[in-house]
A protein has these predicted regions:
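Two-component/phosphorelay signaling modules centered on CheY-like receiver
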Residues: 11-31
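As written
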Residues: 62, 94-100
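Short amphipathic alpha-helix used as the core "switch/output" element in two-component signaling
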Residues: 41, 63-74
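Conserved acidic carboxylate
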Residues: 8
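Acidic catalytic/metal-coordinating carboxylates
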Residues: 35, 61-64
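The feature encodes the CheY-like receiver
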Residues: 58, 86
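Acidic, metal-coordinating helix/loop segments flanking the phosphotransfer/catalytic sites
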Residues: 32-50
Length: 135
């Protein structure tokens, strides 16, 4: 089963993203975290394939958290989500090894779905989030 964690302190945005992903990818297990500490706990217990990471989080910066996660779990795909689409953040996201960067203000659900489908395929999952069986 494909596992995702949504690390976002804005509850409305997090729930909207969760609902959209669940509708599009019904077999995907989705966990949520409202801050960096909760995210680290969920990573240890869930072993996710994908993380959607906000930059501005209570307690810990999402970029620093991304760097920490990538050092421990380089196989996890991390998508940065931010309302602050400035070159410095894009550069920092790349420097800290984030895999993708989306501006919350300009991203569309179709773009997110297409990217998630691509990640599913790359990691050996079916488009609905279930694991491919080898024959």
């Amino acid at each position: 089963m494909f596992k995702t964690i949504l690390v976002e302190d804005n509850l409305v945005f997090r729930e909207s993203l969760r609902d959209s992903l669940q509708l599009q990818f019904p077999s995907m297990k989705i966990a949520e975290a409202g801050d960096g500490l909760e995210a680290l706990e969920k990573i240890d217990s869930l072993s996710p394939n994908l993380i959607f990471m906000d930059i501005r989080l209570p307690g810990q910066n999402g970029l620093q958290l991304t760097e920490k996660i990538k050092k421990l779990h380089p196989e996890i795909t991390i998508i940065i989500l931010t309302s602050y689409d400035i070159p410095e953040y894009r550069e920092a996201a790349a420097r800290f090894k984030a895999d993708h960067f989306f501006s919350k203000d300009s991203m569309t659900q179709q773009e997110v779905n297409a990217l998630v489908k691509s990640i599913l395929t790359e990691k050996g999952f079916k488009r609905d989030g279930s694991k491919r069986h080898r024959s």
